[in-house]
Design a protein with these regions (language model features):
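A glycine- and small-residue-enriched flexible loop/hinge signal that marks low-structured segments
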Residues: 3-8, 17-23, 27-62, 68-72, ...
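Acidic/glycine-enriched edge-of-secondary-structure segments
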Residues: 73-76, 93-118
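NAD-dependent ADP-ribosyltransferases
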Residues: 85
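Active-site-proximal structural segments of metal-dependent nucleotidyl cyclase/transferase enzymes
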Residues: 82
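Membrane-interacting alpha-helical segments
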Residues: 11-12
Length: 300
């Protein structure tokens, strides 16, 4: 039941229309653009030579979207997943640094997994290369892979930050069973995918991880000690549906409660589509509250 997790409330005298919140929570995204070579990316960024696949920081999500959109148009690319990921963050009305670690998607799945693992590892050097270090890291469309999830957990643990992973499952039972492989205060697991109107004007299902990252960043910046608040039970802006129906009956046993009890962050329909979760899978209940984990990270 919701009472098991406390109550979130907000008192506000702000504007009736949403405004962007300035947040000091950088989001790191490991991403690829099918058909984009490292030379294309470096050239677009104004560099003459290309070494390894780049990691770039953008002052806000609008700048990142502009860069990726221009890269797609100028090279006639057809992969809009990164653009949709950035739009998911943008829809949460947050103004924060975005760090993109690019990697090449190969025709061989093994090579792709190696490349994405290297892109996630690159977040450790983000401060040196970009001047910014991520507080949240995601790898949408790939984090359901066991090896990618493991790398996200490893890097998040070494950097004392939070990684958000997307589960692959076709029903509630499968999603819950997947959590047998989780036990970390550094990971938030999300399921199922949610529907948005994507950047191409079509309804599409996308991973929750960038939306949750945007919600956390927004919550952090909403007030002075926002990092001590939970992102749970907040409206997920831009969401128009879920890939699988999630039963939610407030105060009663239901899909949403079973998922949350299994430490899975989900999406419920209750006066809008809302996040429902915020617990890690750590074996010690003290560290199952993500807000507590992140508060100790800030003051340590």
């Amino acid at each position: 039941m919701a009472a098991n997790y406390g109550v979130n409330f907000n008192i506000s005298n702000g504007a009736a229309s949403p405004i962007k919140v300035q947040s000091d929570t950088p989001i790191g995204i490991a991403a690829s653009l099918k058909g984009a070579s490292k030379e294309m990316i470096y050239t677009k960024a104004g560099y003459e030579s290309a070494d390894s696949f780049p990691i770039f920081a953008f002052s806000n999500v609008s700048k990142a979207k502009e860069f990726v959109n221009d890269l797609i148009k100028e090279n006639n690319l057809q992969d809009f997943r990164l653009l949709d990921t950035l739009e998911c963050i943008n829809l949460q009305n947050v103004n924060n640094v975005i760090i993109v670690s690019f990697f090449e998607e190969s025709e061989e799945s093994e090579n792709t997994l190696t490349n994405i693992v290297n892109a996630i590892e690159a977040f450790k050097k983000a401060k040196h290369k970009t001047g910014f270090s991520p507080d949240l890291i995601i790898a949408p469309y790939y984090s359901h892979e066991a090896g990618v999830k493991a790398k996200l957990e490893s890097v998040a643990s070494s950097m004392n930050i939070t990684a958000i992973v997307d589960l692959y499952a076709t029903n509630v039972g499968e999603a819950i069973n997947t959590m047998e492989a989780f036990s970390s205060k550094r990971l938030i697991a999300a399921w199922p995918q949610v529907q948005i109107l994507n950047t191409q004007g079509k309804y599409a299902y996308v991973p929750q991880s960038p939306i949750i990252a945007g919600l956390i960043a927004h919550t952090d910046g909403d007030k002075e000690y926002g990092f001590s608040d939970s992102y749970s039970n907040r409206v997920m802006n831009g969401v128009t549906g879920t890939e699988y129906f999630i039963e939610f009956i407030n105060g009663f046993d239901c899909d949403a409660e079973r998922l949350r009890n299994a430490h899975i962050s989900t999406c419920i329909l209750s006066e809008g589509y809302r996040s429902w979760g915020g617990e890690t899978s750590h074996e010690d209940t003290i560290w199952q509250d993500l807000a507590r984990v992140r508060t100790f990270d800030r003051i340590a």
